[in-house]
């Protein structure tokens, strides 16, 4: 039992900075929305539309680069730190390649925006220009993620948190300058948020690069001239590990976007109640997501040490801690759901619906915690293909169709509206949790030689 308490402390020490880093990242989006809204409602809407396209694209690249964390953790655990710099260097190459792809997609996203039903031409043009300003930050964001994943793979999660808050602090004044046109800069309105955010991502990258170069604990991780060359087998291996995670993230983000579109014809009250509940549950999701990142680091490190039993301990402890946190957040949600809804809106109908949906959110928080931490465990084992198949089946084969049937048809019961989609979320996330646990148990029952051979690839 003692080893589980020790492991829990290690996991929390890694997870807590990740929680704050995620809060800082989320706050940047909130700041953009609020400051654009202060300029005009049209500019705020343009930022919202642009962000809805930016997020799936950039999270695809983000997920691809998550392959670095278990690779570096495994090398660190096995004492092969001399090989880490080469992996990081090839990570930069992969980030550069995917950046070009993302920038091309975002540059041509105007076709999607202008094709939206009944969209105002002025709003559409602002959204397009916002994206075309923001896309220049894609390389900076992904290069920052390479260095952040390097640090996290070495069990150093504090730098990512620090850079997140530096980015947030820089974002506010730079937004102000470009939105309202101060210090000789043009007045760009909502488009200025795109310019500011792109600039901030580059600032975060250069600050992280400066920290890594100065960190005493990383002085032995310096790229040799030979490691600066393209190593296509390494790049291909990183892509093979990261691609399923990238697609899983993409499917998750697009799922919620599709549900929002399906709910939108139901009326203002239904849309507002759904959005409030979704926003709050996303905030609660930060806790298990951070624990997932910590578990990936610990499992990868233990496998690098050649200890499959200790890797199992890390995995089990992560799941247990995640369930405990989910129980606490679920109780908090149940008890305070009405006051929380009132913070967003004072319309009685909206508050009633949002509080009802938050009750459903409380039900799935435990299964959501298990599935996302299970995903982190599988990343640590470098078994990422199963993550893709599990999330695709759970979200798109089970969750969305069942939500559509319950929410918008009378095939099973009378149409339930947004609540039907939330029952779909419960089914999808619970199915994902069960499949993640089954896959984890399957991997852990394999011979140690097989597990370690997979981890060393």
Swiss-Prot record:
Q: Where in the cell is it found?
A: Cell inner membrane
Q: Does the keyword Oxidoreductase apply?
A: no
- What are the UniProt keywords, alphabetically? Antiport, Cell inner membrane, Cell membrane, Ion transport, Membrane, Sodium, Sodium transport, Transmembrane, Transmembrane helix, Transport
Q: Identify a single GO molecular function assigned to this protein.
A: xenobiotic transmembrane transporter activity
A GO biological process this protein is involved in? sodium ion transport
Q: What topology does it adopt in the membrane?
A: Multi-pass membrane protein
Q: Which Pfam families match?
A: MatE
**InterPro entries, from UniProt?**
MATE_fam, MATE_MdtK, MdtK-like, Multidrug-R_MdtK
Please list every transmembrane segment annotated in the UniProt record, as residue ranges. 11-31, 53-73, 93-113, 127-147, 160-180, 188-208, 243-263, 276-296, 316-336, 357-377, 387-407, 418-438
Which family does the entry's similarity section mention? Answer: Belongs to the multi antimicrobial extrusion (MATE) (TC 2.A.66.1) family. MdtK subfamily.
What does it do?
Multidrug efflux pump that functions probably as a Na(+)/drug antiporter.
- The name on file for this protein is Multidrug resistance protein MdtK
The species this protein was found in: Cronobacter sakazakii (strain ATCC BAA-894)
């Amino acid at each position: 039992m003692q080893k589980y308490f020790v492991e829990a402390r290690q996991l929390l020490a890694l997870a807590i900075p990740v929680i704050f880093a995620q809060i800082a990242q989320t706050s940047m989006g909130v700041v953009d929305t609020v400051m654009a809204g202060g300029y005009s409602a049209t500019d705020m809407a343009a930022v919202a539309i642009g962000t809805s396209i930016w997020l799936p694209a950039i999270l695809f690249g983000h997920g691809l680069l998550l392959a670095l964390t278990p690779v570096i953790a495994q090398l660190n655990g096995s004492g092969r730190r001399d090989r880490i710099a080469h992996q990081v260097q090839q990570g930069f190459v992969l980030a550069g390649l995917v950046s070009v792809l993302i920038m091309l997609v975002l540059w041509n996203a105007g076709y999607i925006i202008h094709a939206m039903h009944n969209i105002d031409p002025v709003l559409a043009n602002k959204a397009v220009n916002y994206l075309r300003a923001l896309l220049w930050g894609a390389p900076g964001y992904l290069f920052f993620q390479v260095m952040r994943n390097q640090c996290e793979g070495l069990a150093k999660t504090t730098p990512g948190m620090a850079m997140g808050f530096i980015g947030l602090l820089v974002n506010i004044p730079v937004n102000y300058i470009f939105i309202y046109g101060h210090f000789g800069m043009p007045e760009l309105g909502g488009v200025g948020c795109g310019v500011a955010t792109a600039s901030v991502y580059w600032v975060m990258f250069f600050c992280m690069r400066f920290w890594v170069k100065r960190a005493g604990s990383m002085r032995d991780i310096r790229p040799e001239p030979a490691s600066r060359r393209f190593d296509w087998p390494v790049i291909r291996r990183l892509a093979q590990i990261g691609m399923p995670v990238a697609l899983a993230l993409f499917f998750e983000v697009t799922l919620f976007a599709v549900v929002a579109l399906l709910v939108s014809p139901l009326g203002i009250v239904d849309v507002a109640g759904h959005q409030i509940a979704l926003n709050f549950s996303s905030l609660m999701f930060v806790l298990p997501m951070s624990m997932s990142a910590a578990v990936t680091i610990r499992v990868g490190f233990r496998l690098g040490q050649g200890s499959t039993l200790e890797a199992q301990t890390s995995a089990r402890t992560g799941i247990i801690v995640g369930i405990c946190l989910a129980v606490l957040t679920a109780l908090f949600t149940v008890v305070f759901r009405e006051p929380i809804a009132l913070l967003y809106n004072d319309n009685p109908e909206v508050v009633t619906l949002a509080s009802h949906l938050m009750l459903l959110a409380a039900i799935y928080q435990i299964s959501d915690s298990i599935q996302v931490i299970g995903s982190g465990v599988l990343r640590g084992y470098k078994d990422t293909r199963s993550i893709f198949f599990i999330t695709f089946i759970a979200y798109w084969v089970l969750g969305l169709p069942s939500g559509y049937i319950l929410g918008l048809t009378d095939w099973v019961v009378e149409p339930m509206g947004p609540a039907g989609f939330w029952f779909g979320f419960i089914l999808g996330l619970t199915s994902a949790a069960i499949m993640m646990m089954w896959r984890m148990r399957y991997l852990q029952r394999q011979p140690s030689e097989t597990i370690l051979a997979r981890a060393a690839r």
